[in-house]
């Protein structure tokens, strides 16, 4: 079994998806890369996905589906994942290769003693035109390089966020908690990050600057004008997360 599956949701991503894929390939055959083509029709995304799958059959698989939005691409990745851990990397983002290799080595080591439910790392805001890249790290909130539970988590600063970018989840745990993101909805990465929390018992944090979160495309979901136009979808996602809280029974949880 592979140690890690990384799903790359792609929708008309020809211009940048190869940079994303190439940043992972040196991690080798312990990694499974799923390029999920979410019904791309305007460029060569499907052909690029198939070409990489043919060239690196021991690492890459191409998954083609009718357009269902980012959430359904994440769902498709999870359905097809064979790795012990699961991560999503958006097609316009990329990872630090050396950090990925070190994280995968630690995953293998952790598996020898039962593994963890959630592994966290750092991420970098890679904003076009910014003089300095903003690094999101968590040494103040999490023990470093040791297995721990929620009771040992410190306080996050107001500007610190646990997002899809810095999370690896145990694949079977995601399936056991029946994680399924809504179709044709933006900002569902918040649900991906949040919904599994009640099922997480063992965590591990590595102070690795792994994920480069690219900010700069005009059509990007985090573009201010785009976000204003999609406020209804943000409200929908927030309601879903509130419902998740309402479904949990915290009466038997340790304080």
Positions of PLM-derived features:
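Short, well-formed alpha-helical segments that are part of the catalytic scaffolds
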Residues: 13-26
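Short beta-strand/loop segment that forms part of the nucleotide-sugar
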Residues: 30-40, 61-66, 91
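Short aromatic/hydrophobic "clamp" motif used to bind/position activated sugar donors
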Residues: 86
